[in-house]
């Protein structure tokens, strides 16, 4: 299948490109390199540096390459940044997604897989979160993604386009073959930041909040390995190409780990301790958010291969070692 991967020079998009190429699909990557790295783009993919909101460029790419499916990863993802600068998030995540959806419709793209987020649920209760849970985003980031979900659903109802929305929980780890990993500067993902602290790339790791209603007082999250996530996208694409109806799926394992459990896993992988500083809560952090993933497993036949926190952490730490070795 001929595919366009937006944000394909970023963390998840680069893994998706590898997954598609490994399966024999053709891949065009569109990325403005605002946070991505050209070096992260797979050699076998065609790379175009540009803005996902540039409709003239989009039309040319989609028509010239006969694109049948779009996998849309491009966007901004830092929750506190979205609170400080909400209009930038509505531009980058919502307005530009609208431009992409419009060009998909105009050029006859058949399938659209959208990278959304568990942030659309806001602060759910203690139970695993199903796709039918109330949508109450707490940040402009979550709202910007939910708005795109709504636009995509409305466009699909009006046109010959089918889609899958995938709501990610906490993505972590690296390609098992060492071809890709998270290279984002100023990263905020816990596992990456903890690995950086373990390797001395950071002076310490901050833990925000130790008084949550959880067994050890720290937040609990559902961590999904990035290659497993890419394979969920491949399963979504196969589902759509087989005639599946538009739908939405959570992407997580259905099991949560606390911040301190993650810290201990990083210490085990590194073989030593590092400076961990316990601090106050951050506003808007749910105590616990874990995916109900039965729908993804049942409807798309998704079977994760790396659902083990120690495996995920080892991959992330090995990737950080590679990044350190590559520094001049």
Question: Can you annotate each of these PLM segments?
Answer:
Residues 1-174:
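N-terminal Rossmann-like NAD(P)+-binding domain of SDR-like oxidoreductases, especially those catalyzing
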Residues 90, 138-146, 180-192, 222-223:
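Short-chain dehydrogenase/reductase
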Residues 193-328:
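C-terminal substrate-binding subdomain of Rossmann-fold SDR/epimerase-dehydratase oxidoreductases
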Residues 8, 36-38, 50, 80, ...:
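Glycine-centered small-residue hotspots that permit tight backbone geometry or close packing
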Residues 97-98, 146-153, 191-192, 227-231, ...:
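Conserved active-site helix of classical SDR/Rossmann-fold NAD(P)-dependent CH-OH oxidoreductases
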């Amino acid at each position: 299948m001929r595919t366009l991967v937006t944000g394909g020079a970023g963390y998840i998009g680069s893994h998706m490109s590898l997954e598609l190429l490994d399966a024999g699909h053709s891949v065009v990557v569109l990325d403005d390199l605002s946070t991505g790295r050209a070096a992260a783009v797979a050699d076998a993919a065609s790379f175009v540096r540009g803005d996902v909101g540039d409709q003239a460029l989009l039309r040319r790419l989609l028509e010239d390459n006969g694109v049948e499916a779009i996998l849309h990863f491009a966007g901004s993802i830092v929750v506190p940044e979205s609170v400080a600068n909400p209009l930038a998030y509505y531009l980058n995540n919502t307005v530009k997604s609208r431009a992409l959806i419009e060009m998909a419709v105009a050029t006859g793209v058949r399938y659209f897989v959208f990278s959304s987020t568990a942030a659309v649920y806001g602060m759910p209760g203690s139970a695993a979160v199903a796709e039918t849970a109330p949508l109450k985003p707490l940040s402009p980031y979550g709202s910007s993604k939910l708005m795109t979900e709504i636009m995509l659903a409305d466009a699909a109802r009006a046109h010959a386009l089918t889609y899958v929305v995938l709501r990610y929980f906490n993505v972590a780890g690296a390609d098992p073959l060492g071809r890709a990993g998270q290279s984002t500067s100023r990263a905020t993902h816990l596992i990456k930041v903890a690995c950086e602290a373990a390797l001395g790339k950071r002076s310490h790791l901050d833990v925000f909040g130790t008084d949550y209603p959880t067994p050890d007082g720290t937040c609990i999250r559902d961590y999904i390995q990035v290659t497993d996530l890419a394979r969920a996208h491949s399963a979504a694409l196969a589902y759509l190409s087989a005639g599946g109806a538009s739908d939405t799926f959570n992407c997580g394992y259905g099991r949560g780990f606390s911040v301190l459990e993650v810290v201990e896993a990083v210490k085990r992988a590194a073989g030593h301790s590092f400076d961990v500083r316990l601090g106050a809560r951050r506003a808007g952090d749910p105590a616990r958010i874990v995916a109900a993933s039965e729908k993804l497993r049942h409807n798309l036949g998704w079977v994760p291969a790396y659902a083990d926190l120690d495996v995920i952490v080892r991959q992330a730490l090995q990737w950080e070692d590679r990044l350190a070795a590559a520094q001049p």
